């Protein structure tokens, strides 16, 4: 009896060390790695030019994406058009402080990070230090970005 009780206690204590698993069978770590792989793919596309970024954008964003940035709320179609026409350019200098939070039993992931660089649309160029929030949803087994929001880093937090 004591041996059985000890075995149960030991087994249950080790369960706390296992990675949390979502209802879809994936761990938070696996989901984080999937989201970061998409982000790394975007970074690689940025190094190849705006046409490559537009291709990435088309693959990884929902058709009804809500994209909020310097020029305001824009659609996926508007952003892709501006990228392909040469009207929009993004040049990150430093991107860091990545964090992924998993929600909805593994069906939603929120990616936050900071970025410094320049963004231009039309004849307007913005130097920026931004907080970025991207919300991804798992649709038909694939992660798609459904919300992108960029907010300026307050002056007293810049350079940190």
Describe these PLM feature segments.
Residues 107-117:
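A short hydrophobic beta-strand element
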Residues 7-16:
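Bacterial N-terminal signal peptides
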Residues 61, 115-117, 149-152:
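Short beta-strand segments enriched in hydrophobic/aromatic residues
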Residues 17-60, 156-160:
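Short, low-complexity N-terminal intrinsically disordered segments enriched in polar/charged residues
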